[in-house]
Amino acid sequence: MRKLFIALTFLLVPACLSAQLGGKIYLQRADSLLQRVLSLYEVKKYGLLMETYPRNPKQQITYTANTGSEVTQQEVSFLWPYSAMVSGCVSLYKTSGNKKYKKLMDKQIKPGLDLYWDTTRQPECYQSYPAFAGQNDRYYDDNDWVAIDFCDYYAVTKNKEYLKKAIALHDYIYSGWSDELGGGIYWCEQKKESKNTCSNRSEE
């Protein structure tokens, strides 16, 4: 149960894709997983989700560069695991056409995601922890995954809000390009020490 939320992307999206081949059972499992995450990880105060279940505010997160504001009492998840909900909703809606996933995306997941949006630095993008906690690190790969999901979502909904946001995110992502280290996009804007596969080949 503890890492269920973080694993959502790796379980939910493949399940949705498999539903096209394997029938309704995979779609049902994907929906069950989504509903369980929403139920167990809910943080009503912010309309967001916890990093782990059960909540552990003193946990040590090992997948960030740790150059921004220190999150000493972590109330909600970082952007990377939360963005799995975006991927999940988009995949479920694309696969099933069920408007409950569109409603969930537009009315709950996207408004929650907007709390991570950073307007204090240019180009604007999503930062790793909600803006209400101050400035935090910004990752090119995290924003890339969201931009791809927004493009996919626009393709099936024709909602230009998501297309505009995807374009804005790609403006940010391309700002991370440098010819140093053999060329490519950095991983973390605030700690330009590596150019990982996740920030350079995520489209594939």
Regions found by a protein language model. Give the residues of each.
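Active-site lining segments of carbohydrate-active enzymes
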Residues: 184-193
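Low-complexity, Ser/Thr/Pro/Gly-enriched N-terminal "stalk/linker" regions
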Residues: 20-133, 160-183
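Conserved small/polar residues in nucleotide/adenosyl-binding loops
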Residues: 204
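Hydrophobic side chains within alpha-helical segments
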Residues: 6, 87, 144-146
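Aromatic-rich carbohydrate-recognition surfaces in CAZymes
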Residues: 75-82, 135-157, 197-200
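Bacterial Sec-dependent N-terminal signal peptides
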Residues: 1-22
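Short secondary-structure capping/junction motifs at helix and strand boundaries
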Residues: 3-4, 19, 153, 157-164
